[in-house]
Amino acid sequence: MDDGEGWRLVAASASYKAFHAFAGHAFAELARGGMVPDAGALLASARALCGGEVDLVAVDMPLGHSPIVGRRASDNLVSRVYGGRKAGVHSPSAERPGALSDGLRAEFAALGYGLCTTELRTPGVIEVYPHPALIELTGLPLRLPYKAGKTLTYWPGLDRATRVSRLLDTWGMIVGYLEAALPGAGAALVVPTRPTKAFEDRLDAVVCALVAARALDGRVRALGDTDSAVWVPLAG
């Protein structure tokens, strides 16, 4: 949130349930089964945490004005721009994210938060892909090796202890960049002593929050078309 003194992170959670609980309200009871997002409940928890209305929602999931059944123009454009930096996009499908994406986009739209593609409008929703976002936020040349389940892919010739050490070091480096750009990120992202998917998910959530802040400051660009777009921060 920006209270007039610049952006700062108020809260970050690895799951919907944890986010609602962090708000300190009964909103945790509104989450549907933990894995299925509830747009109304998420907005209510966010309002409780920041003490005001929510201007922009950033989502780390393929979204589109029309049902997603395969690769989109936005996926092709992101891959064209960032594929050489190992941050291309995997193809979405009717199964993944499928109905989950369509339902979430429709829920937010019904609450007045339309999906932004060619221009930013508030209140609104934007799609974020953390890999290219981190490339631009850090200024590094390639996709950062920060996914907990891919250490063998990143460092195939190293033993597990060394791979874990490198992963934790990468997490620490990313947190440093995020804290410098969004105060409060460091407190929300205390690097664990062993890799956890929960930490990785919380890190992605903070990246999305920072991209949303940059968007509200006019420091992003949209890669896509009228149906879908991935919003990427400008370098620096």
Where are each of the predicted segments found?
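RNase H-like (RuvC/DEDD) metal-dependent nuclease/polynucleotide-processing core
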Residues: M1-G236
